[in-house]
């Protein structure tokens, strides 16, 4: 195996050929599909009388359009029911494993892949979804792909891609109380910009990253795309291996763990690996970060003032003015006290069990503010069941939260869970674009799960560090 970064090693390991276009044809170890981006690709196969080449390397779920209040069939939304039925037919005819709502394993695609043990270090993973970068937390190269590429992978298990540069982002020190992985990635995007990663893959490293659990690493890799990067990853280590041991695949195939671990160790970036760029951030100086605008890069520390547009680079001034007008915020003020109408705990960024535990620690013994509708949407049916086994559902329900079924929910306006009018939401999701949560007048403030919980019970953006937290639920 070649020397260098994990990206170099895994790329070379999966190279089938170098194409005349300058792209590389890569073998894909795992192809994840869902109901939104796969139908057209299956249609293209049928037009050409082609079959799925490796159904055993393909796994399907339904997440974007599935309702979270009532998943009984047929769905109330005719379009959602049609997409679900088409996916069911496609996977049945192709012999593809499908985690459907009756399986007990359904959930957001980037939650179920890791929890089932399908996601493994040194893999190449693709999915017709921009947040496929989530799987990079395990030391995989994971890329979101378009419909024509989905077709190619279904037919050949390969994809044509251009190799990118690698930027190492070192987050040093120890994160302080109330500061989570979500704050780290929001700060990275704030500093480097939403286009700062264009042409790059991000390697996350440093003590603060190494100290994170796997769920925290997934949150960071998940939002690499919001920073403009093609993908993001963390080198696998003992934290990775211990987490993998508990997954379905390795519980059923324990011998494979010992067989694969030498490969996992070999693909770690070498200590003397050369990077195209290195950025260092002192994690000990970070505080909870929230967004004030309409892109994930328009963020600010909870105690810091919202920037004046004229103080920003010229190319960012007009978008900042428009964002501040839409959000109704004032330069020079902080986001503390910004009133919210909705609190949303969910999405492929922050809907895993540790996220829910931390939020429950804030919620326990408190009540959702009268002016707020609050919901918890677990990332998968397994997360939901595990949370219920710990009594987390009762903590949330007693506080006034709605406890929903698994799905993408209010992360995007593609299902029944949406903002209404100019409602403002405190959201643990990954995007705050205008209209993202269903209403063109809606306002989304991104933050970590604890901060969402704090906003839910106070009715406004609140520094969670000021609330006494119940750490044992």
Swiss-Prot record:
Cofactor: record remark: Binds 1 [4Fe-4S] cluster per subunit.
Signal peptide coordinates: none
The UniProt record lists the keyword tRNA-binding: no
Enzyme class at the top of the EC tree: lyase
Alphabetically ordered keywords of this record: 4Fe-4S, Amino-acid biosynthesis, Branched-chain amino acid biosynthesis, Iron, Iron-sulfur, Leucine biosynthesis, Lyase, Metal-binding
Residues engaged in binding [4Fe-4S] cluster: 348, 408, 411
GO MF assignments: 3-isopropylmalate dehydratase activity; 4 iron, 4 sulfur cluster binding; metal ion binding
Catalytic activity line of the entry: (2R,3S)-3-isopropylmalate = (2S)-2-isopropylmalate
Entry protein name: 3-isopropylmalate dehydratase large subunit
Source organism of the structure: Haloferax volcanii (strain ATCC 29605 / DSM 3757 / JCM 8879 / NBRC 14742 / NCIMB 2012 / VKM B-1768 / DS2)
